[in-house]
């Protein structure tokens, strides 16, 4: 069979994506004040915040054998406050209100949680095509992916390959 030709896409670069690696031990909500400062510095109302937050947002759906006392309750509350302040939506939970899928697992796979996720601006949620938690490879974390349709014109000099 003949292979399809590769397709080159042009992307508009928009300063809107804080990459988050939340503290992996202790309950440190003040860390997310830094995230807020970064978002304020960007000065854009289109935000895609991505990363390993090291917090489960929904204890019932996003964790398996992961106790709430261990899972940083003050930090979780702070993330919800940030979501309200910047009108951010948890893409996975928005698309899959009851689905259980975990992006992190302990070595023995007994403890699992959805610690890696995307938060996007409410005004961008209609542009979300999909999100996935993929496989893990030589890691305790899985790949998480976000698929967006870009509604902006892609034919000006500010685009990059």
Label each PLM-derived region with a short phrase.
Residues 1-161:
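A shared catalytic/ligand-binding motif for oxyanion handling
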């Amino acid at each position: 069979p003949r292979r399809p030709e590769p397709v080159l896409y042009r992307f508009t670069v928009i300063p809107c994506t804080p990459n988050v690696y939340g503290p992996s031990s202790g309950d440190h909500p003040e860390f997310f004040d830094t995230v807020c400062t970064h978002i304020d510095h960007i000065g854009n109302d289109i935000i895609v915040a991505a990363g390993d937050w090291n917090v489960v947002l929904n204890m019932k759906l996003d964790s398996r054998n992961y106790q709430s006392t261990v899972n940083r309750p003050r930090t979780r509350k702070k993330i919800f406050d940030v979501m309200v302040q910047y009108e951010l939506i948890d893409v996975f939970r928005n698309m899959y209100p009851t689905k259980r899928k975990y992006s992190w697992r302990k070595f023995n796979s007994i403890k699992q949680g959805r610690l890696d996720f995307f938060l996007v601006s409410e005004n961008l949620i209609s542009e979300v095509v999909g999100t996935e938690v993929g496989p893990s490879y030589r890691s305790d974390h899985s790949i998480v992916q976000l698929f967006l349709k870009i509604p902006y014109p892609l034919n000006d000099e500010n685009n990059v390959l």
